[in-house]
A protein has these predicted regions:
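A helicase ATPase "motif cassette" and its flanking acidic/Ser/Thr-rich regulatory loops
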Residues: 38, 147, 285
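Short, basic/aromatic recognition patches
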Residues: 39-48
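Beta-lactam-recognizing serine transpeptidase/beta-lactamase-like catalytic domain environment
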Residues: 22-25, 30-34, 52-92, 101-271, ...
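Short, gly/Ser/Thr-rich active-site loops of penicillin-recognizing serine hydrolases
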Residues: 282-294
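Short, conserved phosphate/pyrophosphate- and ester-handling motifs at nucleotide-, phospho-/glycolipid
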Residues: 96
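Bacterial Sec-dependent signal peptides at the C-terminal "C-region" and cleavage site
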Residues: 2, 10-23
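Surface-exposed helix-capping loop/turn segments at secondary-structure junctions
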Residues: 47-50, 294
């Protein structure tokens, strides 16, 4: 089955997104005070990690207006500088919820369904899939929601396999949701999550609501706990990806308040060394949320 090839290379974009046109509108709505604070928060975390670069974007949910957009890259061992030329590759972890939403749209799966991910290693005719904890014996039998919370690639793949059965059916559903499989940059990924947050036209409202409950669970019980705020409930997803040069992209994308979203945020950090899942990006997300709710 070729679904796995499509899933593992799911770096898709939104068909209707004219990025250049939207950038002009977004930039004119920047909140300079917020922009300055987010720059401070991001730079502190990058310095702490000695990271190569980082990005943070804040979007107003209902209007889609960008309130802050920062890109920083390492200038030398102690300083960072503003940059627009940053990695745009999106992590599989952030794409997982989109794949799950597509599967929910078929009516063939629900988040409470169980899936056996075994010892964390799953072989198909095309490739061997490994969950991040395979060396600890895997997660065994878990629900789809739990699989999403722990970023189980096996759980998401098996969910896609059950829901669609063929690559053609999977692509057809993504096309129906106006998601294309070309290149998805950081701003477009945030736009996609923002559409989920406001119950946009991406999917049936009941399925979007189910996914939003799952994204809350990611933060309360899954790998997104570093994004948890004491001031307001948040929802979102972590992601990690190793680049060809050996460095890692770690990300968190989410929104708040979870039950009445006002703002969505994406944080992306490019660093060398072990990634610690999306924890580092989640911490930046939390600090931004806390500042905006002080």
């Amino acid at each position: 089955m070729k679904i796995i090839i499509l899933y593992l290379t799911l770096l898709g974009g939104i068909c209707s997104c004219d990025l250049q046109e939207k950038e002009t509108t977004y930039i004119s709505n920047l909140d300079r005070t917020l922009q300055s604070k987010v720059t401070f928060i991001l730079e502190n975390k990058l310095s702490e990690l000695n990271a190569l670069s980082g990005q943070a974007i804040i979007m107003e949910v209902q209007t889609g207006q960008i309130k802050a957009m920062i890109g920083l890259e390492r200038k030398d061992s102690a300083n960072y500088q503003l940059s627009e030329n940053l990695p745009q590759t999106q992590t599989l972890g952030l794409i997982q919820p989109i794949s799950i939403l597509a599967a929910l749209e078929t009516g063939k799966v629900k988040l409470s369904d169980t899936v056996n991910v075994g010892n964390g290693i799953y072989s198909t005719n095309e490739v061997e899939i490994k969950d991040h904890n395979w060396h600890r014996g895997g997660y065994g039998t878990i629900t789809i929601q739990q699989g999403l919370a722990v970023s189980s690639e096996i759980a998401v793949y098996k969910t896609i396999e059950k829901a669609f059965g063929s690559e053609q059916a999977y692509q057809a559903q993504l096309k129906k949701m106006e998601i294309n499989l070309d290149s998805l940059n950081t701003l477009e990924m945030l736009t996609l999550y923002n559409d989920i947050a406001k119950n946009g036209d991406i999917a049936n409202k009941a399925n979007t609501d189910s996914l939003k409950q799952a994204l809350k669970y990611v933060v309360t019980d899954g790998l997104g706990q570093s994004a948890k705020s004491e001031k307001v409930q948040v929802a979102g997803k972590t992601g990690t990806l190793q680049l060809e040069n050996g460095s890692y992209i770690v990300e968190f994308c989410g929104y708040f308040p979870a039950d009445n979203p006002q703002y969505s945020i994406i944080v992306s950090i490019n660093k060398e060394g072990l990634p610690a899942a999306g924890f580092m990006a989640g911490e930046v997300f939390r600090q931004i949320v806390d500042y905006m709710n002080k």
